[in-house]
Amino acid sequence: MHRRQFFQEYRSPQQQQGHPPRSEYQVLEEIGRGSFGSVRKVIHIPTKKLLVRKDIKYGHMNSKERQQLIAECSILSQLKHENIVEFYNWDFDEQKEVLYLYMEYCSRGDLSQMIKHYKQEHKYIPEKIVWGILAQLLTALYKCHYGVELPTLTTIYDRMKPPVKGKNIVIHRDLKPGNIFLSYDDSDYNINEQVDGHEEVNSNYYRDHRVNSGKRGSPMDYSQVVVKLGDFGLAKSLETSIQFATTYVGTPYYMSPEVLMDQPYSPLSDIWSLGCVIFEMCSLHPPFQAKNYLELQTKIKNGKCDTVPEYYSRGLNAIIHSMIDVNLRTRPSTFELLQDIQIRTARKSLQLERFERKLLDYENELTNIEKILEKQAIEYERELSQLKEQFTQAVEERAREVISGKKVGKVPESINGYYGKKFAKPAYHWQTRYR
């Protein structure tokens, strides 16, 4: 198939109608660049939402790589979850041979930047933040691995029932800090920042109007971030939980032993990668380090790594090493990890914090509405006072005209919204009384 015709069968409804989706977006600035293209910050003009657009050049891709692009579009469009980067739309330019993916904008960067920040500050990431991020990633993987939503916790002592697996399950296959994005709470304005005014928006607006030191904390405050799992370009969708993938993909530092040994693998490979990510959050370096790929491969196959620093609890250390387990029979699944009491405690804490923040948001919203209503009441009182004064002046003027013997003119049809009929009776009263 000719490269320019590759995406013809995948045309979106807008393209079929002759209106490409990219015409609805305004590009603000480039925020990243990779081997296949760039990442740009854009505004969806009709809704004025701040989004991200991935510009992917497919002209030099082989058939396998182009199929991965289609797979990413398909997977992202199906995965709707608060801890997964939301996919909005896609489009392509046949002349430039570029595919455009429109996705949620995560304003706090990614987990690798967070780890780098703490490493530069020579500080450990607080354990509460580590548990919170682990709990959020597990809820995202639960959606991927079972194809269903994770039930909300009522209490931390709730016992989960084994999930009824959905039709399709997804293995991410490239779980690493750079693919884990950070944002604010859903009630914040990370993708809903509104732009007042015109369709054309100055890109400096978003440099000057970021949510930073307000109720969400400083730019480097990670205590209230929401984790978003993204970059599903290497993900594989399996029709049933019995199927195993065999393709060799992923990032070496976070790659599971079964992938390295070219063996069939399952969602448990994502658990291994997640364990490596959480280990790096605690130790500020990957669990397996080597001077060359062969040495790294040997270390991963053996599965031997150091414990996390003593700054962290034994419980956290234990759950990390349970995920970095070479034995697939003893490596826990997403469901089993979510049964852990500390994970449940972290989940419940996140639920309560989110509920509290929403209450504060509603309180602030009500306060703002109250201020607006008070301002409007003052304005209405002022206007009413002016109307009363004008009414009194009009009546007195007509009374003076009658007393002086002048002919009373026609009452004006309206004075600032008061119609002539309302003035007609008082004017007639004065006219007959003093005749």
Swiss-Prot record:
GO terms for molecular function: ATP binding; protein kinase activity; protein serine kinase activity; protein serine/threonine kinase activity. CDD domains: STKc_Nek2. Keywords: ATP-binding, Kinase, Nucleotide-binding, Serine/threonine-protein kinase, Transferase. Its EC number is 2.7.11.1. Residues 1-22 are annotated as: Disordered. It comes from the Eukaryota. It catalyses: L-seryl-[protein] + ATP = O-phospho-L-seryl-[protein] + ADP + H(+); L-threonyl-[protein] + ATP = O-phospho-L-threonyl-[protein] + ADP + H(+). One of its GO terms (cellular component) is mitotic spindle pole body. ATP binds at residues 31-39, 54. SUPFAM superfamilies: Protein kinase-like (PK-like). GO terms for biological process: chromosome segregation. The active site is at 174 (proton acceptor). Residues 25-343 form the Protein kinase domain. It holds the Pfam family Pkinase. InterPro entries: Kinase-like_dom_sf (IPR011009), NEK_Ser/Thr_kinase (IPR050660), Prot_kinase_dom (IPR000719), Protein_kinase_ATP_BS (IPR017441), Ser/Thr_kinase_AS (IPR008271). PANTHER family: SERINE/THREONINE-PROTEIN KINASE NEK (PTHR43671), SERINE_THREONINE-PROTEIN KINASE NEK2 (PTHR43671:SF13). This protein is probably a serine/threonine protein kinase. Belongs to the protein kinase superfamily. Ser/Thr protein kinase family. This is Serine/threonine-protein kinase KIN3.
